[in-house]
Each structure stands twice: as C-alpha cells, then as structure tokens.
Amino acid sequence: MSEPVSTPEHRIPIRRALVSVYDKTDLEDLVRGLHDAGVELVSTGGSAKLIEGLGLPVTKVEDLTGFPECLDGRVKTLHPRVHAGILADRRLDSHVQQLADLGVEPFDLVVSNLYPFRETVASGATPDECVEQIDIGGPSMVRAAAKNHPSVAIVTSPERYADVLAAVAAGGFTLEQRKVLAAEAFTHTAAYDVAVAGWFASTYVPAEDGWPEFAGETWQKAAVLRYGENPHQDAALYTDSSGGGGLAGAEQLHGKEMSYNNYVDTDAARRAAYDFDEPAVAIIKHANPCGIAVGADVAEAHRRAHECDPVSAFGGVIAVNRPVSVEMARQVADVFTEVIVAPSYDEGAVEILQGKKNIRILRCADPAEERSTELRQISGGVLVQVRDHVDATGDDPSTWTLAAGEPASAEVLADLAFAWTACRAAKSNAILLAKDGASVGIGMGQVNRVDSCRLAVSRAGDRAAGSVAASDAFFPFEDGPQILIDAGVTAIVQPGGSVRDELTVEAAKAAGVTMYFTGTRHFFH
C-alpha cells in the first residue's frame, strides 16, 4: 500500500468540531462563530452546558457514544466513537471505509485545554485535590488530534480562536497550519505531564537525600534577543513554568530592548539589592558590584552606592528594593545607565528617567515568590542547588564568634553585618570594605584572596582607613588580613575554618583589630 500523501495547502473544511475545555475564556465567541458558519458542535460537561445556555444546538458526547459521563466526570470522551472520529487518517481509503462501517463521523476540529493541575498545586491544595486535577481524557484527545494533524486541526489556546474562525471562512486550516497547531498541542501536553511527573516524584517518592529522582521543567520562548554574550552568539529568552514571573516577566516601561548581558547584570543586581531589609541600591557591571549601599531612602542609598566606584558605575545596571523616588530618578538621569529595575516608581520618576533615550526602565515585582533552587548546565547534565540567601545561621551577627580584639560597638557591628551581606554579591574570591552602610572598596573575581584584598584597598583609597572588611571565605594565610590592617581597616568578618586560622587571628590581635568568625561561607561563581 502506498504512503498517504498531503500537499502543503490541503485544506480540510471544518464541518464538525469537538469542544471540551476547562478554560472557557472567549469560548462563547468561538462557538457562536462556529455555529454561524454551519459547524456541528459536539461537547462535554461544562462546555456543553455553556453552549446550551447560549441557545445553540450541541450534541453531548454521551448522546454520541450512548454511554453516560460517569465517575464524577472522570470518564467522558474515552470512547471509540470519539477517538475513532479523531484518529482516522482520511488520506487512507481503508480508514474512511472503517468509519463508514462503524457509523462514526470524523471530527475536523478539536478544541481542548486541560485541568489546572499546576495552579491547584500552587494553591496549597491537598494531595487528593491535586490528583483530582490530573486530566486524563483531555490529553488523550489533544494527543490524538495532534498525531492525526493531516486530517484534524487541534487548538489548545483561546488565543487561537480568532485563527479558527478565520480558517473556517477560508475553507479550513492548511496542512502547514495544522502542523503548527499540532506542535503547540504536544508542547501543551508535554508541559502538563512534566508538571504531574515532577509533583509525583517529589510528593509520593520521598528521597532520603532530599532530592527527587526525577526533575523536569519546561520553557517557553518569550523573546529573541539581538545576540548573546557576544555579537557572534545567537540568543533568546525563555520563561519557565512560573508563567513569566521574576525578571523574565518584568514590564519594560522605556528604552531599547533588553540584551543578554542586560538580563545577566540585572539579575545579579536584584540579587544584591534584595539581600537587604532597608532601602538598598546595587549598581552592577559584568555581574559584579560597582557599589552597594543602604540608606534612609533610595536616593541616599543610590548616592552612596555610586560613590563607591563612579568610574565603573558608568554604563552600569541599577537595582532598587523600594519604589524609585523622583529625587533618585534625577540622580540616575545624570549618569549613563543601561538598566534600572525596581518594584515600582513614584509619580513623575519614570518621566524623568525617560529623558534618557536609551535607558531601559523595568518594573519587576519583589522576588519573594521566586524559586528556592537554581540550575547550572554542565556538559552532559545540570547542577541543581538550593539558592544561596543571607539566611544561614552564620549570617546572623548574634551567632558570630569573636576571634580577636574587643567586641565591636553597635555601629561597627552594623557595618560588619552590612559588609558581610553585600560581600555575597561579589564573585569569589571577594573582599568588601564598607563604612556607614555603604561599600567603599570591592575586590572580586581574583584567583587568590591576597589580590582581592589589594584590589579592595586600592579602590577604596583613603576611605579604607576606618572601614570594616568582609571576606566571602576564610583567609588561608595571614597575608590578606595584613593588607587590610595596613590600610586602616578596624574590623574584619570572615567564615573562619582554615587550618591556619591562628595566624590570621594573631595578626588581628597584634594590630588591635576586631575579627569575627561566622562559620558560614558565601562563595559565588
């Protein structure tokens, strides 16, 4: 028997449609349009009730199959008279003949979307309630229609309803259009199955090590970017199953389109700014901080963050953990800035910033609901870890161990706590000098801690005297702390834990410098 052949045009007129949806957005417009075009409607459950309520003729599936919906709606469309009508390949004479012999009418269009499983899980529902929202008949219909796209059009999104009515008027979808719809349908069911499988693996198969045996995620293309990290690299933005929340779902209020590097730097900036409870501003370039500060308000925090390294801040990315005030907007408008991101903007602030033609202004909700784990791809796999936050036991100054010198005053301890928190935003090896709630010198990304100390002191200049220092990991030798001490640093906070801690402690004691151990490390790569 020869293989069935379809031409690219190959329109199939839409005369009979099976409609069974959970999300009834714009369904009324769709079914009215189908009815007006003379399309026979077959439907189930709530969809059929809606159609009947509009006074439109509809054949209920139970009347089609001769078998009632049962088990609280768990069984509706799982019947040969339904699936044969969906799966028959009408390019094959044998299939057409079998339908005739069985008395089954084929469907030209299937419109279906699925129970809200992911949303039910997110609502905090019980396991039984979640299981009840696992759709069975819906995915079966969707997959059947998608498989048989040479003969059937499958629509899974209300956003396609206008296309459906246009296709009806044009004599049906073309084969190429049906292929696109089928791809969307399989994407729809694949994402659904990944969500169900992931939930089952994490809920019903507890792992002794705390990590499920299966972890899955799906991403949807949100934008094609001009290029990647460099102009010769193609790039795109995809959103995860959270529905486009977080930075990926930020609202852009002004400016050129976001670039790959803009996203990387903005993500790092938000990470730094939201580590603080007080009004805070972080200025980032190449994913490293040019300056971080807290203040009585965001304008003060921005001034002080900018003062840390004004040269590097030129062309940087700014993140704020509070609404941007008019005063801060005026300050930002005086400096070339690539991106500013904030939860909101006071009246008049956006208009001031819009005076800079190319600045990208983003509004992005607080990251409180963002995921607790993060991924990093490696060759052949992916690394998954719990996201690092400043919430470990050792991040609380009340738990620190005084290793050298006198206990810090309340003011110095507050600066140490600030420096410790801010240091987490710098790439390892990281040393951060701070004074009065603002960074004054940052050394980061060096392959030895001594060079990071030198870099931090060099950038701080005269401001190093009287400042405090934080190190994201322990000092392996006393040479790093000695550089800080010689520059006039009065107190140091570090994790401790080196086999040579006593040498570091002795150097601090000899200089009368206070040193605390946190017992917590904050590497950042």
From Swiss-Prot:
Keyword Hydrolase attached: yes
Domain MGS-like: start-end pairs: 10-156
Keyword set, alphabetical order: Hydrolase, Multifunctional enzyme, Purine biosynthesis, Transferase
Recorded superkingdom: Bacteria
GO MF annotation list: IMP cyclohydrolase activity; phosphoribosylaminoimidazolecarboxamide formyltransferase activity
GO cellular component entries: cytosol
Catalytic activity: (6R)-10-formyltetrahydrofolate + 5-amino-1-(5-phospho-beta-D-ribosyl)imidazole-4-carboxamide = 5-formamido-1-(5-phospho-D-ribosyl)imidazole-4-carboxamide + (6S)-5,6,7,8-tetrahydrofolate; IMP + H2O = 5-formamido-1-(5-phospho-D-ribosyl)imidazole-4-carboxamide
GO biological process: 'de novo' IMP biosynthetic process
SMART domains (alphabetical): AICARFT_IMPCHas, MGS
UniProt EC number: 2.1.2.3, 3.5.4.10
Record's keyword annotation contains Hydrolase: yes
Pathway(s) served: Purine metabolism; IMP biosynthesis via de novo pathway; 5-formamido-1-(5-phospho-D-ribosyl)imidazole-4-carboxamide from 5-amino-1-(5-phospho-D-ribosyl)imidazole-4-carboxamide (10-formyl THF route): step 1/1; Purine metabolism; IMP biosynthesis via de novo pathway; IMP from 5-formamido-1-(5-phospho-D-ribosyl)imidazole-4-carboxamide: step 1/1
Listed Pfam families: AICARFT_IMPCHas, MGS
Family note: Belongs to the PurH family.
Domain notes: The IMP cyclohydrolase activity resides in the N-terminal region.
Name of the protein in question: Bifunctional purine biosynthesis protein PurH
Name of encoding gene: purH
